[in-house]
Amino acid sequence: MAFLKPLGTIITIGSLFLMGSVVSAKDTYKVALDGTFAPHAMPKMAGGVEGFNVDLANEIGRRLGVKMDITAAQWSGLLPGMQAGTYDFLVAPTTLTESRSKSMLFTEGYLNTDFQFVVKKGTPMVNGLAGFKGKVISVNKGSAYDKWARSLADKVGWKVESYGTNTDAVQAVISGRAFANVAGNTVSARAVKKNPKIALSFRHSTGKVFAMPFRKDSPALRNKVENVIECMKLDGTFTKMSEKWFGVTPTPGDAAVTVYAGYGQPGFQGYEATPHVPKCN
């Protein structure tokens, strides 16, 4: 059995699994997410929302023995709503940044948030940005991927074409108007899972992760939820959820299968280096 190591080291799946119990002091947690960010959360035909982060929220509630009161709202109102006390914490996929860590607490990362290229199925794999030189890259207009691709247009030598939705940008690849589409890795993976005409290509690592945000006054709650997240990594739940919603199996080193020492994400404000062993049911 391996134990959590000091700051800067990690525990990988299979190296640690201890039995224990998690006790909650509340019957219900009010949480929120953006209900239009597929495949993390999206409307159901019968009402309500479904997706990776909906499953994540419900599994956290199940393991804590509490009800998760999930609100689907516009992204722009989520962080202010949490800070105002409307929500106990957010279950929306939230990119952890240095700026955000100054005003909020975060769990350790549970998913990588990278830039993923999609190409027509049968296209040879591209192993780096240089492989897209002279190609047309389609993007969702106004997105972070649009801005990023345009910032590299001269350096890489690609042409960027913007579309009103990422679905339209993917269709441009299928029709041959574009060589590749670039979007978030989870969004791209979901698109490939649903469409046999396209395939995943180069994945550009940003070094960033999705983590769960809490108010600065909630370190105990953050740590309690992080304990559950770590257990879900250790017992393969995150792997199963990734395969279900993204069609992708996490590889060693991915945030979905990596338990970090301490509480929070190493290197960011709010991180606690306190050694602990996840207590898993």
Task: Give the ranges of each region predicted by the language model.
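Ligand-binding clefts/hinges and TM-proximal coupling segments of bilobed small-molecule sensing domains
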Residues: 67, 144-161, 196, 200, ...
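A ligand-binding cleft/hinge motif common to bilobed small-molecule-binding domains
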Residues: 77-80, 92-102, 150-151, 172-206
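Short helix-initiation/N-cap motifs at beta->coil->alpha
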Residues: 69-80, 124-125, 160-175, 206-208
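Periplasmic-binding protein-like
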Residues: 35, 111-119, 189-229, 248-270, ...
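Flexible hinge/capping segments at coil-to-helix
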Residues: 120-137
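Hydrophobic residues within well-ordered alpha-helices
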Residues: 60, 82-83, 132, 173-174, ...
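Extracytoplasmic small-molecule ligand-binding "clamshell" domains
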Residues: 26-94
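Beta->alpha turn/N-cap motifs
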Residues: 32-37, 71-76, 85-97, 113, ...
